[in-house]
């Protein structure tokens, strides 16, 4: 039976794992790395590069190299955080027809789920290469604080990649699974502090033994889906730009190529300063003006970096305190603090965590791999391979509908364990009202306009009656993926309307199907391209081999034999230029057949030479080995014992 893989679809890096027996295993990609950069590049020849290969060419192709796309997934173009990103990304963020934030590359508008799907395809292929069988099912992780639109968009990305997403699981919960599965330390409450490339989550989780079952119950979760390592990088970039402007008067923000080089340098400097006190950013020929080329050389100390990002680190404290309060716990109730996400390697972040929770965070969890491992364990649970594990997750934000006066009436409170169902009866606001609009909202504000709109639908044909008389039952149903289904029913007529919430933004079914087909077509194109490369290589190797042999043994051939081989060589070289696989294969075969005579001559020559050498060798051996008469031959003997 095919396995369900676990994928950590990260902002900066992604990781894939699978259950092998009772143990989760992180799978290395084709480049031998355990994590893959979540970077997708669109090259000139329509080739799509993913991971390390995309990252390598980013400096020469900044406008078409897409990174940190997870920050845009499920977001509207007008959102403040999106507008902020537009000013710092070398690629173009554009408004889609449905007002979502999309990206433009090579003149084509691309939806974030379609870009993320390319990363998932790479993860899927990594798993297939390792397992030696097709993979069609996956558990994919998302930040705990992702709203409904973002979860739906992640699920869409999975479908575009050809994966059936069996479960969407929260990243801190996955990390808790990875941490707690083997621990036999009794009941304990843990805090998972997850500061990744683009998002921050804090989850308070209770791990308990309940009737022989390992139970992971999320008590509360909080976070910020636009706070992560990318923001730390941006602060360093801004500092470097300011320093260079002071020195040269040139603003590098207007130069996309320079901006991409700065991004790489800022990330490297940030990482270096986790283990050293000072580093220097050296970027020769960063730009040029009338006076000639300009070079950037800026020293950054760890103290300077910490002052640049201090406010970002401080922003993580609020959600931590809120999560503790929502869980009804104090700091002293927390047994362990787990760090997840690459940004938690920064010493200042670890200091902050210690300050918030009053204890040293644990260092025995790999912050880059724990989430994928947890997703693989959840895959094992769903498959039935992992027994006695129960995962109780929560919805991160309250859900409700807009009611009279523009107020949000909550049906499901935040931190409610999922799956869950809630229902409430509402009525009409006007006399003889025959239709109602159900406007679904997600958030914590009392005023409807202050919350995220997830979508709306109408319930029509309500019999005319005075206001307040009709009884309309609204049911909210959240599935195990944290995705909402809403229905409204007129209790008098039994008429019902229901929707799986797809935000007024989001991708339509037709768009998803088109993207699925595009991804499949691209996979077919890739296969054809690979087959063509293989045929070319084979033909090229054959041409090289025959030419070499012809130079050495051509004089042994009859005139017509030699000219036949030369003609076949010429045709094979012409075929190589054509780029047509069938032609190349046919001409390679023709060259192979034409060179048979040459191979025979080579073989005969080699045999003759070998015979002559053997004869000469025997004669000389006899003359050398025969002792002169009367001469004593001394010999040393060594006893060789048989190995027992």
Curated annotation (Swiss-Prot):
Its biological purpose: Acts as a chaperone.
Protein name: Chaperone protein DnaK
One example GO MF annotation: ATP binding
Family that this chain belongs to: Belongs to the heat shock protein 70 family.
Phosphothreonine, modified sites: 199
Low complexity bias (residue ranges): 604-617
PROSITE patterns cross-referenced by the UniProt entry: HSP70_1, HSP70_2, HSP70_3
Organism the protein comes from: Nitrosomonas europaea (strain ATCC 19718 / CIP 103999 / KCTC 2705 / NBRC 14298)
Top-level taxon: Bacteria
Ranges for region Disordered: 597-644
Disulfide bonding pattern of the chain: none
Alphabetical UniProt keywords: ATP-binding, Chaperone, Nucleotide-binding, Phosphoprotein, Stress response
Induction or repression: By stress conditions e.g. heat shock.
């Amino acid at each position: 039976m095919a396995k369900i893989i676990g994928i950590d679809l990260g902002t900066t890096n992604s990781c894939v794992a699978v259950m092998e027996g009772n143990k989760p295993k992180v799978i290395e990609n084709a480049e031998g790395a355990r994590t893959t950069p979540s970077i997708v590049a669109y090259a000139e020849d329509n080739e799509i590069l993913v991971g390390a290969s995309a990252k390598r060419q980013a400096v020469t192709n900044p406008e078409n190299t897409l990174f940190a796309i997870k920050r845009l997934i499920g977001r509207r173009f007008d959102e403040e955080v999106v507008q902020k990103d537009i000013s710092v990304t070398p690629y173009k963020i554009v408004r889609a027809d449905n007002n979502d934030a999309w990206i433009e590359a090579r003149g084509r508008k691309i939806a974030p789920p379609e870009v993320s799907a390319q990363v998932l395809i790479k993860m899927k292929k990594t798993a297939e290469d390792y397992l030696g069988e097709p993979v069609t099912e996956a558990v994919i992780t998302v930040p705990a604080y992702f709203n409904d639109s973002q979860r739906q968009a992640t699920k869409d990305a999975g479908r575009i990649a050809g994966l059936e997403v069996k479960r969407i699981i929260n990243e801190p919960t996955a990390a808790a699974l990875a941490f707690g599965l083997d621990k036999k330390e009794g009941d304990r409450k843990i805090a998972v502090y997850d500061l990744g490339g683009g998002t921050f989550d804090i989850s308070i989780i209770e791990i308990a033994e309940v009737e022989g079952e390992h139970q992971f119950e999320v008590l509360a979760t909080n976070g910020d889906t636009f706070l992560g390592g990318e923001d730390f990088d941006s602060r360093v970039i801004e500092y470097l730009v300011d320093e260079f402007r002071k020195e040269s008067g040139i603003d590098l923000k207007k130069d996309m190529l320079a901006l991409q080089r700065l991004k790489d340098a800022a990330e490297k400097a940030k990482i270096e300063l986790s283990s050293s006190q000072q580093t220097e950013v050296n970027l020769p020929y960063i730009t040029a003006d009338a006076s000639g080329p300009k070079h950037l050389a800026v020293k950054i100390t760890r103290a300077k970096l910490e002052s640049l990002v201090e406010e970002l680190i401080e922003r993580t404290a609020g959600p931590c305190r809120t999560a503790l309060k929502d869980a009804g716990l104090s700091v002293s109730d927390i047994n362990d603090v787990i760090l997840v996400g690459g940004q938690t390697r920064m010493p200042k972040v670890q200091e902050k965590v210690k300050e918030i929770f009053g204890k040293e965070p644990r260092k025995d969890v790999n912050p880059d791999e724990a989430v994928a491992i947890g997703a693989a364990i959840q895959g094992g649970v769903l498959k039935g391979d992992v027994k006695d594990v129960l995962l109780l997750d929560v919805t991160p934000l309250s859900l409700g509908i807009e009611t009279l006066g523009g107020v949000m009436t909550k049906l499901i409170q935040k931190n409610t364990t999922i799956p869950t169902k809630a229902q409430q009866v509402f009525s009409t606001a006007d006399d003889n009202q025959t239709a109602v609009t159900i406007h679904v909202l997600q958030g914590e504000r009392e005023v409807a306009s202050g919350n995220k709109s997830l979508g709306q639908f109408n319930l029509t044909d309500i019999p005319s009656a005075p206001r307040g008389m009709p009884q309309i039952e609204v049911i909210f149903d959240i599935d195990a993926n944290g995705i909402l289904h809403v229905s409204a029913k007129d209790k008098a007529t039994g008429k019902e309307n229901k929707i799986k919430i797809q935000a007024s933004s989001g991708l339509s079914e037709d768009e998803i199907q088109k993207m699925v087909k595009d991804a499949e077509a691209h996979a077919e194109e890739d296969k054809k391209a690979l087959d063509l490369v293989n045929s070319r290589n084979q033909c090229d190797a054959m041409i090289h081999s025959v030419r070499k042999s012809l130079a050495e043994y051509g004089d042994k051939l009859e005139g017509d034999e030699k000219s036949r081989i030369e003609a076949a060589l010429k045709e094979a070289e012409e075929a190589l230029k054509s780029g047509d696989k069938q032609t190349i294969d046919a001409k390679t075969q023709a060259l192979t057949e034409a060179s048979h005579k040459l191979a025979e001559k080579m073989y005969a020559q080699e045999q003759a030479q070998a015979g002559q050498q053997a004869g000469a060798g025997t004669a000389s051996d006899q003359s050398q080995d025969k002792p002169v008469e009367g001469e004593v031959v001394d010999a040393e003997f060594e006893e060789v014992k048989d190995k027992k």
